[in-house]
Amino acid sequence: VTHRHEPRGASGRAERAVAEPIRGAVENGRVRRPSRDGLTIEQAAAIESPREFRLSPDGRRVAFTAEAAGARQIFLMPVRGGYPEQLTATEKPASDPQWSPDGRRIAFVCDEAIWMIEVEGSHQALVTQHPAGNRSPRWCTDGHQIAFISRRRGWDQLWVVDAPVPRRGRPATRPRSAEPAALTKTGVDIDDYVWSPDGRQIAATSQRLPDLLTSQIHIVDVATGQQRLIAGEVSWETGPRWLPDGSGLLMITDEDGWFQVVRVSVEGNERTALTTGRREHGEPGGGWGYVPLPSPDGKRFVCVEIHDGLVDLLVGEMACATGTDPLRAGESGSAVVSPFEGIWMAVGWLPDSSAILAIGSSDRQPDDLWLLPMPEAIAEGAKPRKLTRSLPTVVDTAHFAVGTRIAFEARDGLVVEGTLYLPASAVGEEATRVPCVIHSHGGPTHQALRDWLPFRQLVAEAGMAFLSVDFRGSTGYGREFRWANRGEWGHTDAFDVIDAAHWAAAQTWCDGRLAHYGASYGGYMTLCVLAEEPSLWRAGIDLYGDSDIAESYRHGDRPGRIDLERMMGKPDDPEAAPAYRRGSPLYRVERIEAPLLILHGRKDKRVSPLMTEKIVEALEIEGKHYQVHWYDDEPHGLKKRENGRDAWKRCLDFLRRHVLEQVDED
């Protein structure tokens, strides 16, 4: 569903002084088009990496999800090489595959229900389902129970259910699913959890009202449901993983202002730092792939180190009674096991602790699975081995734009960093000046990583620079920077983005034509910066962003509402209300000058479609130049390949028309 509006008798774009382009940028009155040999939208949409890799208990196979016939299915593949075997055949997407301890079964999620399937046979059984949804299935270490998270009582509670018994012959009737039991009480949302090696306890992460500035870890007794706090009283602590012998856990904490890996006792009264320094060794969500993993022999651990928009994988010794020095940020070259600069996430250790299974990507390579040897093996000549190949042969990445780190001082003196991607036409002896697309990431508690993002390459292929900005509030720069936009949404963080645009316009490679692009919080930033400094922009693209954050608090889903409350307080609080109003671009629509493209999914629960409906109504009233397109079958984000392809085309066409001012040669 598409709607266009162009003001009568006006171009919808304010006049701007544009730097004179270097000779060669314009030929015969037309903007020179990029080479036809570059990446196409069709190629970019066809690149689909496997996801959600899970290593089998014996280390011989890996389960993962990949698209097949329009839905993601679970596949199995030998770690040492071989052709993938499709395990599931479901109409709805399958996700989150989890091996049973004996390696004979896999639990997974499909259509918000928990299912189990036998690895060597066709038997598939329903574990549990509920209209409120179910997620995160995890096997008890004895294989007799499966825990999961469900909102069936209105909160993200931990539940436990008996696992279906492996098939022994064909049953005469369809067995009835066991009834699950709640393990944690209502009133608390569980974010993540992990079983202890003996199956008697669970370490669970949660954020508990009214304190939203800490993340806590509790040990839950499976038999009684009693909980014991071991971490997070005064800091953000998450990502717990049990040591193999059950004597303690690894986790990440920002106690010193940066996310570090620590070893903590089961009682929580003893801690040992395993990393140190001014770099992040985890992220606030404690997300899969970013948590520290102890080796099976208990002697080592693997963790991430985030810097300069990159994520390295480090291996360190388990510091305990030996007094081994912790890994120090920026000085751990010999401990880095990731083979190239990019974004790395640990999947798991081989059972003999000899290697790590990991996912690696970069701005030139999509996600692929790798087997990474230990540092001593690398010193003896062992090499990392790539197990999957997601990039089609027809796609030549040699000409792809590669990120360059930049930094500038914001108007209040804060140093803000980002990553710049220049098109080929802006590099070399015959370089021409080019426009620049400023990109704000989502979150905002996130950062713009130098990972596989086809749209930035498509922008570069079209002849425009692409500058991703880590405005205040981004992760990767320590706690002080991460909290720097508390109470400041749409204000000082928007100033950072505007200052980045001014920095870009002053560079010799830029011709002064600027656009802003972003999704989710980045889409919200589009509206904010276009309203804050209208004459700066040639175009803006808003993908499912907020327009009125007070109304978003009232109409969005619970996780989004809690995030807003953490960062801005409650909109009905008289002290917070002015900041909510200031941070809502809906009330400044009359200031917007640049043409605006808005894309949104009708099933979005995080950013309610009401946000786009309200901004479109205001744009219509003010007679602004805009286009809006709705995806009737999409939630927050564009999940379907065909919709992603359509969105890329709409965005590029919009930029070509309003920034490049290209004339259709046909």
Which residues are covered by each model-predicted region?
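Beta-propeller blade-edge and WD-like acidic-aromatic loop motif
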Residues: 3, 21-39, 61, 65-86, ...
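Short linear segments in intrinsically disordered or otherwise low-structure-confidence regions
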Residues: 5, 9-14
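Extracellular/periplasmic ectodomains of large secreted or surface enzymes and adhesion receptors
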Residues: 12-13, 21-41, 45, 272-298, ...
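Conserved beta-strand positions that form and line the central face of beta-propeller blades
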Residues: 43, 86-87, 125-127, 179-183, ...
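Conserved beta-propeller blade repeats
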Residues: 46-63, 89-109, 131-149, 155, ...
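Flexible loop/turn segments at secondary-structure boundaries
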Residues: 211-212, 237, 258-259, 281-282, ...
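Cap/lid segment of the alpha/beta-hydrolase catalytic domain
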Residues: 390-507, 511-512, 519-520, 554-555
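Active-site-proximal cap/loop segments of hydrolase catalytic domains
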Residues: 471-666
